[in-house]
């Protein structure tokens, strides 16, 4: 579903409409330009680039000349990109890591760096594919605080996640799929009590 939404896979049928515009058939960079950013279950950073440079790559999607147009950008434009990248690193708690290589960052920081890079595209919707995967309790708590801040700042979060404590603590609405079929949707507390959900995920019947 995430791969269809973000232009990696094409839908077999139907239309994909976001913010009143059809985006089915768009390549990932065009989807991003229309306001959808994503992170991946398996972290996809530029490991040999610094944290700052990784965020700048995301920011280039919002410039007139794109990633390959560095020679065409003015000094002022490039300075603005650098400044915004620094602001996003600070926003995500990574200001002190700006000049560190992505590969040298702790796992939790790499997760937050991927979010910072996604935010650099100025999304309306941030799609997060298992953002807490592999995190310890402390890292997950820090992630939750960051996501709550992003949501409070007006960006819609679309979350795939198996950490139910995180899901229930963050979500306004939860949709449950069982082998690709939607079996429940609604407020977190109601979905958590749903008999179909309990049976599908706990493997037993509910009286």
What are these model-predicted stretches?
Residues 1-207:
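Glycine-rich phosphate-binding loops of nucleotide-dependent enzymes
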């Amino acid at each position: 579903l995430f791969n269809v939404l973000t232009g990696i896979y094409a839908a077999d049928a139907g239309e994909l409409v976001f913010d009143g515009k059809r985006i089915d058939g768009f390549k990932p960079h065009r989807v991003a330009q229309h306001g959808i950013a994503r992170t991946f279950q398996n972290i996809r950073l530029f490991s040999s680039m610094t944290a700052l440079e990784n965020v700048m790559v995301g920011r280039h999607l919002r410039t007139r000349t794109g990633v390959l147009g560095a020679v065409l950008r003015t000094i002022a434009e490039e300075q603005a990109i650098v400044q915004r990248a620094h602001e996003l690193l600070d926003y995500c708690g990574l200001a002190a890591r700006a000049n560190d290589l992505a590969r040298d960052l702790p796992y939790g920081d790499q997760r937050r760096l991927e979010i910072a890079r996604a935010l650099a595209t100025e999304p309306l919707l941030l799609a997060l594919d298992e953002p807490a995967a592999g995190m310890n309790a402390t890292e997950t708590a820090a992630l939750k605080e960051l996501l709550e801040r992003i949501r409070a700042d007006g960006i819609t979060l679309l979350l795939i996640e198996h950490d139910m404590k995180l899901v229930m603590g963050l979500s306004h609405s939860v949709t449950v799929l069982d082998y690709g079929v939607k079996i429940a949707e609604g407020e977190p507390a109601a979905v958590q009590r749903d008999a179909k959900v309990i049976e599908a995920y706990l493997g037993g019947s509910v009286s």
